[in-house]
Amino acid sequence: MTDPGPAHDGRSRCPWADGSELYRDYHDREWGRPLRGSTALFERLTLEAFQSGLSWLIILRKRDNFRGAFAGFDIDTVAGFTDRDVARLMDDAGIVRNRAKIEAAITNARAVADLDVDLSDLLWSFAPPPRPRPAAIGDLPAQTPESRAMARELKRRGFRFVGPTTAYALMQATGMVDDHLADCWVPLNGR
């Protein structure tokens, strides 16, 4: 499928949002809308890293559990997690129990806490100029020069599990790029 498909409400959406009410709500209310704030962006960065190799629907279904397990993504709290917290998280069936991803989330919280700039300012500094919306799903890149630069800078600053593809997914999810298809009903994000 390359064009937005109509949902039961008659609206034309990006095709990935079809098939699940949870996907549809995420698409309509969150995805591609500009998001700022260190805690909110740390949450999205963490969830995008946990999604790597999995369906985003799995992450959406577990998002509330992730919020509880990771103290509402409070950066200072997560940065203070210990081996005991890693063990607790590994026993939590409500989240994705992947030790490398859990440890990366803690490492990333520590990296955010050590930043000399606001996380929001750092991430948004890689947002490219607005461009026309793509006509079809096949027109969407998996990564861009900006996402590669973001991933490099985050790695330099001690972040883990944030490669250029994950960085681009973060850019899409948080409105740094507007990758809703041209025929999608969601208004331009106007960032």
Task: Locate each region found by the language model.
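HhH-family (HhH-GPD) DNA N-glycosylase catalytic core used in base-excision repair
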Residues: 1-191
